């Protein structure tokens, strides 16, 4: 009887090596670890201005095909304020708002300057209030409420914002309202997100910036945790930059209050920044600290966080890849180890981290570095404006005749604008395509542009113009010289005849 060969024992992890690949007794080859995809640097990509839309449901029939459309009671056409502070919903009032006009409250009360981002959640616009002239950010939901539950879920974000309250490191909510089944949130205007800043930078952020962002975000988390609130979605896309190297924490859509009845129905955020205890359903303030630790690791090392796999497991077992963290200072590495502790009970809290000497007070050299970077950015913009002014003056001095030459009438009358400009609704000052009225068809535009030309017209009446009505009729007799048809071969022979 043949004896079974002894099973190979799994190699135990040594100092400086990542944890074992799995806990199974199946032997793992020594070279198997090299076949697994390791950690990598971030790949260059475009600025993150939007999120991918949600995939459509393929196994269900739209409700509009089963039931006739009807307007629910909460689908108000008039704007109504949304608040969970005990205030009753009331109609919004603004000096520039006229309820009799077809435009919405958003269109009448704000001047839209640009779109900051869009995705499946909705759109965010940079606007200027017509009431006080200040700049704000307005978040508008993409689609109307699908039902009472969907409306309650979207309006819960307003309640989460109101629970946060006022803090210098948290994005401030100005007001919220609903109109026509659409939710609007007006917040203070911040700079780009930390994710957009890193993508524009294209490399690891300087450690001076990292310390400042870490301290400000810890202050925001300490404010939330003191009220029993957990953010559950801390990541670079939800951290917004401000002046002088400061930052603010925003997007409280997944905020949960510990000890409430709805705490069991929480939603996790991005899996790349998820704490390991969330897989067991254990929600606490330590999850935000872990997510912030991965955020700092990503921006300080320009590291691409894995969505899953062995690298995802290693980061949640306390392993920090030395090929990325070798360039960090010993203080920052120690803070990352405290924040990425696998056990949430042993993980450092936001208050404990802020009590460290390296985070107790903002570093003077870090603040000076951020101020110097901002000054250089403004100086570069000023230099470009000055250079453009000098070029304009040089052109005027080199060609003084252009200054003295009077501006006469144009040599040719201006032509009609091209069809593409007339059909382009982006040049209109209206907000939506529906407000443009009946659209112009290409035939109508061409009918208006026929006869319009940039070349000078001759002084002739339409009667003197070329008449094309009889182009297919027979020509009048005697208008062309008569000729006798001949054979082509005979014509060729005549050309060859020397006589």
Curated annotation (Swiss-Prot):
Q: Where is this motif: Membrane-association motif?
A: 382-398
- What binding partners and quaternary form does the record give? Interacts with CDC2-CCNB1 complex. Can also interact with PIN1 when phosphorylated by CDC2-CCNB1.
This chain's function reads: Acts as a negative regulator of entry into mitosis (G2 to M transition) by phosphorylation of the CDK1 kinase specifically when CDK1 is complexed to cyclins. Mediates phosphorylation of CDK1 predominantly on 'Thr-14'. Also involved in Golgi fragmentation. May be involved in phosphorylation of CDK1 on 'Tyr-15' to a lesser degree, however tyrosine kinase activity is unclear and may be indirect.
Residue ranges annotated as compositionally biased, kind Pro residues, are 16-28
GO biological process assignments: G2/M transition of mitotic cell cycle; meiotic cell cycle; mitotic cell cycle; negative regulation of G2/M transition of mitotic cell cycle; negative regulation of G2/MI transition of meiotic cell cycle; regulation of cyclin-dependent protein serine/threonine kinase activity; regulation of mitotic nuclear division
Q: Name the InterPro entries on file.
A: CC_SR_Kinase, Kinase-like_dom_sf, Prot_kinase_dom, Protein_kinase_ATP_BS, Ser/Thr_kinase_AS, Tyr/Thr_kinase_Cdc2_inhib
Catalytic residues as annotated in Swiss-Prot or TrEMBL: 233
Q: Where is this region: Disordered?
A: 1-29, 42-72, 451-485
* Record note on modification: Autophosphorylated. Phosphorylated by CDC2-CCNB1 complexes on undefined serine and threonine residues. The phosphorylation by CDC2-CCNB1 complexes may inhibit the catalytic activity.
Q: Which residues form the Protein kinase domain?
A: 110-359
Which residues bind Mg(2+) 1 per the record? 238, 251
> What is the name of this protein?
Membrane-associated tyrosine- and threonine-specific cdc2-inhibitory kinase
PROSITE patterns named in the record: PROTEIN_KINASE_ATP (PS00107), PROTEIN_KINASE_DOM (PS50011), PROTEIN_KINASE_ST (PS00108)
> Which lineage is the organism of this entry classified under, starting from the top rank?
Eukaryota, Metazoa, Chordata, Craniata, Vertebrata
Question: What activates or inhibits this protein?
Answer: Negatively regulated by hyperphosphorylation during mitosis. The hyperphosphorylated form does not associate with CCNB1-CDC2 complexes. The PLK1 protein kinase may be required for mitotic phosphorylation.
């Amino acid at each position: 009887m043949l004896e079974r060969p002894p099973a190979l024992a799994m190699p135990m992890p040594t100092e400086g090596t990542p944890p074992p690949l799995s806990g199974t007794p199946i032997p793992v080859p020594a070279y198997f670890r090299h076949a697994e995809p390791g950690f990598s640097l971030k790949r260059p990509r475009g600025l993150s201005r939007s999120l991918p839309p949600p995939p459509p449901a393929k196994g269900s029939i739209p409700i509009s095909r089963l039931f006739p459309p009807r307007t629910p009671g909460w689908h108000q056409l008039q704007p109504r304020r949304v608040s969970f502070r005990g205030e009753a919903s009331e109609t919004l009032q603004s000096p520039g708002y006229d309820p009799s006009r077809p435009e919405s409250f958003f269109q009448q009360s704000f001047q839209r300057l640009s779109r900051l981002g869009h995705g499946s959640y909705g759109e965010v616009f940079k606007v200027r209030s017509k009431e006080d002239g200040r700049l704000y950010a307005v978040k508008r939901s993409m689609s109307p409420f699908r039902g009472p539950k969907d409306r309650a879920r979207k309006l819960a974000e307003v309640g989460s914002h109101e629970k946060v309250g006022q803090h210098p490191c948290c994005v401030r909510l100005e007001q919220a309202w609903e109109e026509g089944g659409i939710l609007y949130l007006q917040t203070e205007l911040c700079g780009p997100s930390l994710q957009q800043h890193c993508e524009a930078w294209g490399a690891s952020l300087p450690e001076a910036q990292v310390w400042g962002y870490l301290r400000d975000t810890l202050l925001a988390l300490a404010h939330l945790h003191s009220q029993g609130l957990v953010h559950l979605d801390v990541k670079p896309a939800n951290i917004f930059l401000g002046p002088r190297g400061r930052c603010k924490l925003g997007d409280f859509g997944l905020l949960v209050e510990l000890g409430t009845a709805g705490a069991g129905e929480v939603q996790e955020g991005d899996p790349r920044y998820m704490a390991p205890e969330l897989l067991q359903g254990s929600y606490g303030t330590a999850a935000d600290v872990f997510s912030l630790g991965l955020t700092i690791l990503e921006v300080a090392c320009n590291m691409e966080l894995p969505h899953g796999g062995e690298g995802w497991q290693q980061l949640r077992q306390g392993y920090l890849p030395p090929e990325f963290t070798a360039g960090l200072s010993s203080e920052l590495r120690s803070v990352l180890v405290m924040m990425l502790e696998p056990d949430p009970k042993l993980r450092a809290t936001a208050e404990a981290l802020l009590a460290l000497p390296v985070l107790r007070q903002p570093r003077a050299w870090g603040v000076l570095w951020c101020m110097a970077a901002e000054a250089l950015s403004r100086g570069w913009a000023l230099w470009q404006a000055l250079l453009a002014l000098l070029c304009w003056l040089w052109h005027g001095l080199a060609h003084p005749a252009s200054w003295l030459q009077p501006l006469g009438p144009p040599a040719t009358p201006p032509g009609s604008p091209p069809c593409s400009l007339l059909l382009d609704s982006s040049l209109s000052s209206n907000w939506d395509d529906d407000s443009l009225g009946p659209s112009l068809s290409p035939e109508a535009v061409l009918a208006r542009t026929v006869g319009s030309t940039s070349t000078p017209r001759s002084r002739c009446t339409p009667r003197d113009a070329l008449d094309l009505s009889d182009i297919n009729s027979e020509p009048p007799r005697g208008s062309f010289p008569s000729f006798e048809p001949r054979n082509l071969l005979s014509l060729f022979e005549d050309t060859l005849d020397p006589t």
